[in-house]
């Protein structure tokens, strides 16, 4: 293998004329040393003294030679290996796990770098994989450095790293853009501290083959002298442009690979491999099938065979057979002859990969690249907040990266499946994810970093300092979501983080909705482990629960055995178990919770029985349940990450562990179901949808609508979903339809704010500072409290009339009241939380479980409604049979009365009951502690009791019919 061009003289550009023939790496190292005080350089005073951009063509050694030589600035290469390095490290970030791991291992095994020993002076750190020294050259995914910048102080980062090399800096993932924002802010803060902070400022190097040097240099405020251009490829790459485009790129890719194989049958195995890029795993599977069929034809013709290796992020994480085949030498690989079933040596490997092989990966035997020219990424559309995986033409910069996989060790060939004319029409650079996806999970981090620079401590959109700020509609949507979640509030001078928002901003990777759902879990006394599991299922299963199935033909019925493996014991022996569970829960997310519980039961069982090779037995268990083992492991890891995040910010991740849904009995099951649904509702309330009986569609507050059908649950009135997905209508046309990802039915479980679901009105000046707002007109009597009730408050027996409240009025209380109540909320506190609406008029088809409910029912028409009074603590004691009986008893003229006898509130409930019944002879000296006493009062008012239950001497549950 020849030397990288960084180590060969005469490849420098954009440097003084006298240095054009220098060895690039020597020039770069000298340039850096001239700016380091320990080598005689001046103390840095600006970003120009600490930021360098290197644009270096693929194959130049920017991912291998550059980090090693930078590390040698800190540690002489002739230092004996037994001498432990104790200085600061060099971190080199990579956009993907594969490249981070591969580069570290390759350098550790290379004879060119004898001083670089894996685990001693060089290593890697990714989320799933780590093998690194405490100090040295560390290859890491961008997410690792991002998390450190998020959680560590400037001094802690400076004490850990002397150099930060951001490789493939042209990639515009959300995390990379945020990481650059963090780095720039950190450098500016340390420079502002003068010489004390400047002496240890880390040196930042941005490298890429296709970086927009003007854009990045402008962002960091540096000049042309901070940009070094290096020519890359040592060998030529021939591009074979087709005459026509293809309308079936998978089939054409297979035909092209087969043609290459047959026409180059005399290739040496060490210079023969083919790499084919595909946009997703579905295409990889289909193409792999076609190539394996082609192997059958080759066997019939008695020609050498191909070894097909499908590679994606999952293959890398598991280090499966295909990944091991990629890393092995070709001479050690075998392929089975499909005719004789005998193994033989393959002529070449055909690697079918997603974009994980696009950057930073060197396959020394690679000679051919086939590129269909497509890229698949998430796109989100605002204000509807609907998104999905969209397949579009790849940008020219990405195509150059793909082309750059060959021509490193010997001449290569590039086969695009599109014409040169098409290539010239597509965008030069990829769109940043912050444009295509919006700020997403990094929004609160953007807010915090922007507030740090604001003298008044408020968030102003125009002050966001990123390579590209979020689009206005995406930013407005993110602000709205944060306000609704109680994480952001409008102060006198602008938008500010609430105390909940401050806690949420400390999470490394939880979105606004995920953070809110965790907080709601503490408010409502839910088992936080259940909350974490639900969020992990949403993250891994992505669109639908059936994505957890390891089967090509996926449907909900196939989930039955997996769901039943995790349900509570008291439900396991009922008839038509899965159908009844599906009907009872009416919730995809809770079914996902039970699927994971079953997997967890299996883990505990195998460990307790001390079986050998637990992983093998778990795989077999998943196969029996038709589940993807890899997906279940990912849920386990994601769940652990969420629980760790909670612990890091000081919250108890095992809060209410004893109240997990899987451990419920007949008396507590429905209460826990309601609690979890309440948490989902509070987290995703912007994604609540009501059924329109006229249009036969579900509609939401943003005006979007979609159809939803369930074989068992017929047209529920109100549902909530974590996200609205764009799903392709057909494979032939670029058309999509809207559909919910997971569905949680709220009917009969949660008190939904109907007014909140009305079509939203434009929010004036949502991106600017606070303005004087006109007083809102009173809302209809059915909404007694405004939909933005801010926090807990002690009721102390006063009625709302005594508090001089009006319909539609907003109540504001110090949010410290809320924070101080986490996680143990006193029972005598009226449980009205952030953003919880209070209303009382609902369709009779719904049995509402709510934690707080107040009404003032003077002059209210009771048409098709069930009226509620009081706190439904007793409702939590209803069994499943009670629930079913009650559900069928309710009629349009029914009257549901739920009562909790807290002494401090008794006077108020009597007052409210008196107003509601229009009956002014209720004796205040009565001791309303028994069902008969309450029945007497209601009979006097013309009501007949039809159902009653008294779980304890202090709790009553009665249904009356007019």
Curated annotation (Swiss-Prot):
Residues 43-229 form the Helicase ATP-binding domain. SMART domains: DEXDc, HELICc. The lineage of its organism: Viruses, Varidnaviria, Bamfordvirae, Nucleocytoviricota, Pokkesviricetes. ATP binds at residues 56-63. It is found in: Host membrane; Virion. It comes from African swine fever virus (isolate Tick/South Africa/Pretoriuskop Pr4/1996) (ASFV). This is Putative RNA Helicase B962L. Its EC number is 3.6.4.13. PANTHER family: ATP-DEPENDENT RNA HELICASE (PTHR18934), PRE-MRNA-SPLICING FACTOR ATP-DEPENDENT RNA HELICASE PRP16 (PTHR18934:SF91). It catalyses: ATP + H2O = ADP + phosphate + H(+). Its main location: host cell. Keywords: ATP-binding, Helicase, Host membrane, Hydrolase, Late protein, Membrane, Nucleotide-binding, Transmembrane, Transmembrane helix, Virion. Gene3D superfamilies: P-loop containing nucleotide triphosphate hydrolases, Vaccinia Virus protein VP39. GO terms for cellular component: host cell membrane; membrane; virion component. GO terms for molecular function: ATP binding; ATP hydrolysis activity; RNA binding; RNA helicase activity. Induction: Expressed in the late phase of the viral replicative cycle. It is a single-pass membrane protein. Belongs to the DEAD box helicase family. DEAH subfamily.
């Amino acid at each position: 293998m020849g030397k990288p061009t960084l180590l060969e003289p005469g490849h420098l550009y954009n440097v003084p004329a006298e240095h054009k023939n220098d060895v690039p790496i020597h020039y770069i190292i000298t340039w850096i040393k001239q700016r380091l005080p320990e080598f005689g350089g001046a103390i840095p005073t600006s970003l120009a003294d600490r930021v360098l951009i290197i644009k270096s063509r693929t194959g130049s050694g920017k991912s291998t030679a550059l980090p090693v030589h930078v590390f040698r600035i800190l540690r002489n290469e002739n230092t004996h290996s037994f001498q432990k390095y104790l200085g600061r490290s060099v971190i080199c970030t990579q956009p993907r796990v594969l490249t981070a791991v591969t580069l570290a291992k390759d350098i550790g095994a290379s004879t060119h770098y004898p001083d670089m020993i894996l685990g001693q002076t060089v290593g890697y750190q990714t989320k799933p994989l780590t093998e690194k020294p405490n100090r040295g050259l560390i290859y890491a995914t961008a997410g690792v450095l991002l998390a450190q910048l998020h959680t560590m102080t400037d001094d802690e980062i400076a004490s850990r790293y002397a150099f930060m090399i951001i490789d493939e800096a042209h990639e515009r993932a959300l995390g990379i853009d945020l990481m650059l924002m963090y780095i720039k802010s950190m450098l500016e803060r340390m420079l502002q501290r003068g010489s004390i902070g400047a002496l240890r400022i880390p040196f930042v190097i941005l490298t890429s083959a296709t970086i927009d040097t003007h854009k990045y240099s402008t962002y960091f405020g540096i000049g042309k002298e901070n940009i070094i251009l290096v020519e890359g490829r040592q060998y030529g790459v021939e591009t074979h442009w087709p005459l026509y485009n293809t309308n079936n790129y998978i089939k054409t890719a297979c035909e092209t690979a087969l043609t290459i194989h047959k026409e180059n049958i005399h290739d040496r195995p060490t210079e023969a491999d083919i790499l084919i890029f595909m946009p997703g795993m579905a295409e990889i599977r289909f193409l792999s099938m076609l190539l394996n069929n082609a192997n059958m034809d080759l066997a019939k013709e008695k020609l050498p065979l191909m070894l097909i290796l499908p590679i994606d992020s999952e293959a890398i994480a598991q280090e499966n057979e295909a990944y091991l085949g990629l890393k092995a030498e070709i001479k050690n690989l075998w392929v089975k002859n499909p005719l004789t079933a005998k193994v033989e040596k393959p002529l070449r490997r055909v690697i079918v990969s997603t974009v994980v092989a696009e950057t930073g990966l060197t396959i020394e035997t690679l000679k051919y690249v086939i590129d269909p020219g497509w890229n698949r990424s998430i796109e989100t559309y605002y204000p509807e907040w609907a998104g999905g995986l969209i397949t579009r033409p790849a940008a020219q910069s990405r195509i150059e990266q793909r082309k750059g996989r060959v021509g490193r060790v010997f001449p290569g060939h590039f086969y695009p499946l599109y014409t040169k004319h098409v290539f010239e029409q597509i965008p030069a650079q990829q769109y940043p994810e912050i444009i295509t996806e919006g700020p997403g999970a990094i929004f609160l981090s953007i807010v915090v970093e922007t507030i740090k620079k604001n003298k008044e401590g408020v968030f102003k959109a125009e002050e966001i300092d990123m390579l590209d700020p979020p689009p206005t509609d995406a930013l407005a949507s993110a602000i709205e979501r944060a306000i609704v979640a109680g994480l952001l509030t409008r102060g006198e001078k602008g938008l500010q983080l609430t105390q909940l928002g401050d806690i949420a901003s400390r999470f490394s990777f939880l979105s606004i909705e995920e953070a809110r759902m965790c907080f709601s879990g503490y408010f409502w006394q839910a088992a936080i482990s259940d909350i974490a599991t639900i969020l992990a299922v949403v993250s891994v299963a992505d669109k639908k629960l059936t994505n957890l199935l390891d089967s090509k033909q996926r449907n909900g019925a196939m989930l039955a055995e997996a769901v039943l493996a995790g349900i509570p014991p008291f439900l396991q022996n009922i008839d038509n178990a899965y159908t009844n569970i599906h009907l009872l829960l009416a919730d995809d997310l809770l079914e996902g919770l039970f699927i994971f519980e079953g997997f967890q039961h299996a883990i505990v069982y195998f460990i307790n029985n001390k079986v050998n090779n637990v992983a093998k037995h778990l795989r077999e268990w998943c196969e029996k349940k038709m589940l993807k083992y890899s997906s279940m492991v990912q849920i386990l890891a994601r769940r652990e990450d969420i629980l760790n995040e909670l612990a890091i910010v000081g919250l108890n991740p095992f809060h209410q562990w004893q109240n997990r849904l899987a451990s419920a009995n007949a008396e507590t099951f429905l209460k826990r179901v309601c609690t979890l649904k309440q948490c989902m509702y509070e987290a995703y309330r912007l994604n609540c949808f009501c059924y329109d009986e006229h249009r036969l569609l579900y509609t939401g507050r943003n005006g979007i609508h979609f159809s939803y059908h369930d074989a068992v649950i017929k047209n529920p009135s109100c549902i909530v979903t974590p996200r609205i997905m764009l799903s392709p209508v057909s494979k032939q046309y670029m058309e999509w339809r809207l559909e919910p990802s997971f569905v949680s039915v709220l009917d009969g479980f949660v008190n939904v704010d109907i007014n909140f679901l009305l079509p939203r009105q434009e929010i004036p000046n949502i991106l600017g500072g606070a303005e004087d707002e006109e007083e809102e007109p009173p809302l209809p009597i059915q909404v007694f409290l405004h939909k933005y009730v801010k926090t807990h408050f002690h009721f102390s027996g006063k009625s709302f009339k005594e508090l001089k409240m009006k319909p539609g009025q907003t109540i504001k209380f110090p949010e410290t009241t809320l924070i101080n109540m986490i996680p143990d909320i006193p029972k005598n506190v009226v449980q009205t939380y952030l953003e919880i609406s209070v209303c009382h008029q609902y369709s009779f088809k719904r049995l509402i479980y709510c934690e707080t409910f107040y009404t003032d029912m003077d002059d209210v028409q009771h048409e098709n409604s069930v009226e509620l009074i009081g706190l439904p603590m007793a409702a939590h004691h209803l069994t499943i049979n009670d629930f079913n009986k009650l559900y069928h008893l309710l009629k349009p003229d029914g009257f549901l009365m739920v009562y909790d006898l807290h002494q401090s509130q008794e006077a108020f409930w009597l007052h409210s009951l008196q107003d509601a019944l229009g009956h002014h002879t209720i004796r205040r000296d009565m001791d309303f502690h028994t069902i008969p006493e309450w029945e007497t009062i209601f009979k006097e008012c013309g009501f007949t009791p039809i159902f009653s239950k008294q779980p304890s001497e202090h709790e009553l549950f009665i249904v009356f019919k007019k």
